[in-house]
């Protein structure tokens, strides 16, 4: 993928969500909600502070994150792959193995 996010932006590929319940029932429509977990594919250089310094991001390429799938998250198709572009502040947590 040939994309470089700017500043505090992060490119995330959404993880596939389970389409079966624990009891084996196939979920469809609103019951099969979109996942709010994904893998970080690219990160920007960092957030520019008021004093002009750049604060590096806490997330890095390869991290699995939980994110807020809200207003500030933009969905784009790049190289025939659906990705999300978001600010680091839209990321709620890093999943540690």
From Swiss-Prot:
Modified positions (N6-succinyllysine) in chain numbering: 34
The UniProt family comment states:
Belongs to the GroES chaperonin family.
- Signal peptide residues are none
Predominant place of localization:
cytoplasm
The alphabetical list of record keywords is: Chaperone, Cytoplasm
What's the protein here called?
A: Co-chaperonin GroES
Gene Ontology, cellular component aspect = cytosol; GroEL-GroES complex
GO terms under biological process: chaperone cofactor-dependent protein refolding; protein folding; response to heat; virion assembly
**Residues in coiled coil:** none
Which InterPro entries does this UniProt record tie to the protein?
Answer: Chaperonin_GroES, Chaperonin_GroES_sf, Chaprnonin_Cpn10_CS, GroES-like_sf
How is this protein's activity kept under control? Activity of the GroEL-GroES chaperonin complex requires Mg-ATP.
Where does this one sit in the cell? Answer: Cytoplasm
Q: Which GO terms describe its molecular function?
A: ATP binding; identical protein binding; metal ion binding; protein folding chaperone; protein-folding chaperone binding; unfolded protein binding
What role does this protein play?
Together with the chaperonin GroEL, plays an essential role in assisting protein folding. The GroEL-GroES system forms a nano-cage that allows encapsulation of the non-native substrate proteins and provides a physical environment optimized to promote and accelerate protein folding, probably by preventing aggregation and by entropically destabilizing folding intermediates. GroES binds to the apical surface of the GroEL ring, thereby capping the opening of the GroEL channel. Regulates the ATPase activity of GroEL.
On assembly, the entry states: Heptamer of 7 subunits arranged in a ring. Interacts with the chaperonin GroEL. Can form asymmetrical complexes, composed of one GroEL and one GroES, and symmetrical complexes, formed between one GroEL and two GroES oligomers. The asymmetrical complex is the functional unit. It was suggested that the symmetric heterooligomer may represent a transient intermediate in the chaperonin protein folding cycle. Another study shows that the symmetric heterooligomers are substantially populated only in the presence of proteins that cannot be folded by the chaperonin.
């Amino acid at each position: 993928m040939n994309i470089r996010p700017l500043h505090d932006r992060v490119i995330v590929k959404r993880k596939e969500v389970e389409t079966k319940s624990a009891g084996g029932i196939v979920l469809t429509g609103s019951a099969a909600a979109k996942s709010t977990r994904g893998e970080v594919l690219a990160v920007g250089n960092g957030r520019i502070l008021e004093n002009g310094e750049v604060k590096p991001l806490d997330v890095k390429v390869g991290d699995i994150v939980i994110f807020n799938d809200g207003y500030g998250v933009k969905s784009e198709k790049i190289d025939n792959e659906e990705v999300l572009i978001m600010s680091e502040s839209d990321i709620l947590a890093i999943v540690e193995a």
